[in-house]
Regions:
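Short secondary-structure junction motifs
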Residues: 16, 40-42, 121-125
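Active-site "cap" helix and flanking loop/linker of ATP-utilizing ligase/carboxylase catalytic domains
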Residues: 72-124, 155-179
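Conserved metal-phosphate-binding beta-hairpin within the catalytic cores
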Residues: 47, 115-147, 157
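Short clusters of hydrophobic/aromatic residues that line enzyme substrate/ligand-binding pockets
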Residues: 18-21, 80-82, 95, 147
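Nucleotide-sugar donor-binding and catalytic loop/hinge architecture
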Residues: 1-3, 37
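Beta-alpha-beta core module
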Residues: 150-153
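Glycine-rich phosphate-binding loop of ATP-grasp-fold ATP-dependent ligases
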Residues: 5-32, 53-55
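Phosphate-binding site of ATP-dependent enzymes
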Residues: 26-109, 130, 135-137
Length: 179
């Protein structure tokens, strides 16, 4: 145990109940577990991975599952919490992310396979941490990502020239094919 953990409820979203522990004592870990458990659900503990925070929308727009342009999330002090997701004007989203073509292609290939492997073959958004050496870690797959006009999936779609209305139609069409 090196004190670097992420503690979070298994079924929450938007970083609710999430604790990033950088140099935590065992007592601080126990406290984070207890707070995360207040929602009455299973708590997850993960390695705290440092790097650039990226996210990738993966959608089937009628031609098979494809990764959209990568988005880099630049939150103040690297803390992309609930406040910085929904209320801050300081968080910056760079789409497409400024990542080498080689790393971009590797990330896109891996997220497409990851989405298919969990049955998210219509749409999802996958969070990725990019390390300084070019290696990366998939953090989680969000199978029901935000879909407001200001959410990250529509941002990636707009970068490809796809309107919000067209995106919603395509996601709904894929859902009705499965339903």
């Amino acid at each position: 145990f090196n004190g670097k953990l992420v503690i979070k409820p298994s079924k929450e979203g938007s970083s609710l109940g999430l604790y990033k522990l950088k140099n935590a004592t065992l007592e601080e870990v126990k406290e984070a577990f207890a707070k995360s458990q207040e929602a009455g659900m299973t708590v997850l503990a993960e390695e705290y991975v440092f790097g650039r925070e990226l996210t990738v929308a993966v959608l089937d727009m009628g031609e098979g599952l494809k990764a959209f342009p990568i988005i880099e999330i630049k939150a103040p002090d690297g803390d992309y919490d609930f406040e910085h997701k929904y209320y801050s004007d300081e968080t910056v989203y760079v789409c497409p992310a400024e990542v080498s073509e080689d790393v971009t292609e590797k990330i896109k290939a891996v997220v497409e396979k990851a989405a298919l492997s969990v049955g998210a073959d219509a749409w999802s958004r996958i969070d990725v941490m990019l390390r300084d050496d070019g290696s990366f870690v998939l953090l989680e797959i969000n199978t029901a990502p935000g879909m407001t006009p200001h959410s990250l999936v529509p941002l990636a779609a707009r970068t490809c020239g796809i309107s919000y209305e067209e995106l919603v139609k395509q996601v709904a069409a894929r859902a009705s094919l499965k339903g």
